[in-house]
C-alpha cells in the first residue's frame, strides 16, 4: 500500500484526532511522514518499508513466528542502530501510540529537536530504550546489509546493477531486503 499526503492527513484527522491540531502546524513533509508511519503501524500493523527498499526474499518464514512482536532491523551505525526505514508490528501495539504521544508532546511544547529526533530514527532508538517494547532486533544483514557512509558497503553497492533484481539478490545473498538509501527527503 502506498500512502499519500492526503491519506496521512485523513489518518490523523479521523483516527487520531487529538493529534490533528498539532499535525496541521508541522511544516516539514518528512516529519509528517515519520509521524504517520508509526501511527500506520499502530492502526494496521504489518510491514512499513521506505520506497527505496527492495524485497529480495519471502519474509513470512521469519515474521510468522514473531507475530506478536515488533520486529526492527539493526544497522551498523552506532548512532542510529535501529533505523525507521523498515519496521514490522502487530496491529494495535501500544508502543507506537506511546511513541506518537511523546513526539506530539514535544511538538506541542515547541521542544527543539532535529527532524530525526521528532519522530525519525533517533526518536525510535530513544523510544525503544525508554519504553522497552516486546520486540525482536534482526541481524543487520537481514534488512540493512548496506550501511550508508561505510566505505566497504558503498564500494560493494556501487558494483550492483540495482535495476536487475537477480543481480541485487546475488549481491546480498543472505538478506531479505535491502535499501538503496536514496535519502530523498
Where are these regions (language model features)?
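Glycosyltransferase-associated regions of secretory-pathway enzymes
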Residues: 1-33, 49-185
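Small-residue hinge/turn detector
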Residues: 34-46
Amino acid at each position: 500500500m502506498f500512502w499519500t499526503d492526503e491519506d496521512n492527513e485523513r489518518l490523523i484527522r479521523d483516527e487520531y484526532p487529538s493529534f490533528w491540531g498539532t499535525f496541521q502546524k508541522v511544516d516539514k513533509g518528512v516529519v509528517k511522514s515519520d509521524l504517520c508511519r508509526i501511527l500506520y503501524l499502530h492502526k494496521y500493523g504489518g510491514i512499513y518499508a521506505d520506497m527505496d527498499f527492495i524485497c529480495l526474499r519471502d519474509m513470512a518464514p521469519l515474521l510468522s513466528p514473531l507475530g506478536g512482536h515488533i520486529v526492527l532491523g539493526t544497522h551498523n551505525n552506532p548512532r542510529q542502530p535501529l533505523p525507521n526505514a523498515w519496521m514490522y508490528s502487530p496491529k494495535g501495539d501500544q508502543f507506537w501510540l506511546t511513541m506518537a504521544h511523546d513526539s506530539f508532546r514535544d511538538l506541542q511544547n515547541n521542544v527543539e529537536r532535529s527532524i530525526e529526533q521528532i519522530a525519525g530514527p533517533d526518536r525510535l532508538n530513544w523510544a525503544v530504550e525508554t519504553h522497552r517494547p516486546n520486540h525482536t532486533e534482526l541481524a543487520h544483514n537481514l534488512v540493512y546489509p548496506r550501511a550508508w557512509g561505510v566505505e566497504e558497503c558503498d564500494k560493494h553497492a556501487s558494483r550492483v546493477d540495482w535495476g536487475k533484481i537477480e543481480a541485487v539478490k546475488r549481491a546480498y545473498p543472505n538478506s531479505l531486503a535491502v535499501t538503496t538509501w536514496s535519502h530523498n527527503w
